[in-house]
Each structure stands twice: as C-alpha cells, then as structure tokens.
From Swiss-Prot:
GO terms for cellular component: cytosol. It is an enzyme of class 3 (hydrolase). One of its GO terms (biological process) is DNA repair. Transmembrane segments: none annotated. Belongs to the HAD-like hydrolase superfamily. Coiled coil: none annotated. The gene is yrfG. This is GMP/IMP nucleotidase YrfG. The keyword rRNA processing does not apply.
C-alpha cells in the first residue's frame, strides 16, 4: 500500500515505542523466553509446559491493559517482573532509523509524542538505557489513562489531554489492531512498521501502508 503523507497537513506525530522506536527483540526475548523459563523453573515444569501455560495466560488478556501491566504479571505469576525488567534494561536498544527520523521531525516543526502501552516502570527502564526521551516532546503511557490503545476511550482521553487534531496527525505502530483503533478514532495517517524485531522476518499489513525504514520518509518531510 502506497505511503502518501501530505506533511504540510501534519502537526503531530504519535509514535509507539516497542517495535516502533525500539527494537522489539528486547520484549520478545523477555516475554517469550525469559519469563516462561523463569516461571517454569520456579514451578518445576518443563520449558514446553511453561510456554504453553504462558501462551494461554497472554491470550486471555490480549488487547487489554493487563497484557502490558507488570504489576498484573507479577501477581499472576509470582515473579518480580519489575526487577527482571530492570536487570534486562541494557538489552533495550533504539532502531537505527529512530534518531534520524525524530530529528527530522523536530527540524520540520512537528510535535513528537510517544504513546505507548508500556507500563511506567518498563518505560522508565528503557528511557534510562536509550535516552529516547531527549528526542521527544511528550511521553505518554496509556496506564496513566486506564485504557490501552486498542480502546476508543484512550484516544478520546489523549486527544483531550494533548489537544491534538486527529485530521492533522500521523500515527506509527507495529500492531495492526492498534492502527485499526487509531483509524476508527479518525487519525488521518496510520502507518505500520514491518520490521519491529530485527531478528525475525518482516510482517505484512492488510489495511494500512507500512515501511521498514523511517529514513525513507525524510526527503519528503524536509
């Protein structure tokens, strides 16, 4: 699907964090390997049994705020997920195209807002190790509002809190379900990321334009 952004009509760029500005390899390793292995070792079950259990646990709360909530998972699994996140912090890395794109947005006068479903502790750890916050104008965790990006109530709350105009906004995320929610709210431009995890094959989007390198956008932006 062709990317055709009329930049002169864009005031605000909303950006997801994990997989969009940061390499999703951190989260995929944490939630698909480290957490199941740690829970399995604690409970004396095989790695396969632990993974199957975790898959069901994840599925049960998919697209809800609990899916992203470290406190929920700590209580559910009997693990100190916040401490584990802190310990793994050095693994958090920026995508190669993140800083060039964010700086180009700044140079062109666009407002850069982080909108992440990440738990505040998760966000703080990643900011500490990446310095991402130095390249953004505003950082928002959906936990502050009580709804994830999949929920229309979140979009209304964010618009009210920031004053953004949906018809003059670009939103970039690596989840098609979340892009769908943004489009439903009225966000004019919704763009998917095909390579959120540098270690796995690119993904495809059915209903939204997508790309694998933000630097492709810079010439038209400038």
């Amino acid at each position: 699907m062709h990317i055709n952004i009329a930049w002169q009509d864009v005031d605000t760029v909303l950006l997801d964090m994990d997989g969009t500005l940061l390499d999703l390899a951190f989260d995929n390793y944490f939630w698909q390997k480290l957490v199941p292995e740690t829970w399995g070792a604690k409970n004396g079950v095989t790695p396969q049994e632990a993974m199957e259990y975790m898959r069901q646990q994840y599925h049960d709360v998919q697209h809800t705020l609990n899916w992203y909530c470290l406190d929920y998972w700590s209580e559910q699994l009997g693990l100190d997920i916040c401490a584990m996140t802190t310990e793994m912090g050095p693994r958090a890395v920026l995508r190669e195209d993140t800083i060039p794109f964010l700086e180009a947005l700044k140079a062109s006068g666009k407002q850069r807002i982080l909108l992440t479903n990440a738990h505040p502790h998760n966000l703080a750890v990643k900011l500490e190790h990446t310095g991402l916050d130095a390249h953004l104008d505003l950082l928002l965790s959906t936990h502050t509002f009580g709804y994830p990006k999949e929920d229309q109530r979140l979009w209304h709350a964010v618009a009210e809190a920031t004053g953004l105009k949906a018809e003059r906004t670009l939103f970039i995320d690596d989840s098609e379900a979340i892009l769908d929610a943004a489009a439903q709210f009225g966000i004019r431009y919704c763009l998917g990321v095909t390579n959120p995890d540098s270690g796995i094959a690119e993904k495809q989007y059915q209903r939204h334009p997508s790309l694998n390198d933000y630097r492709r956008l810079i010439p038209s932006l400038m």
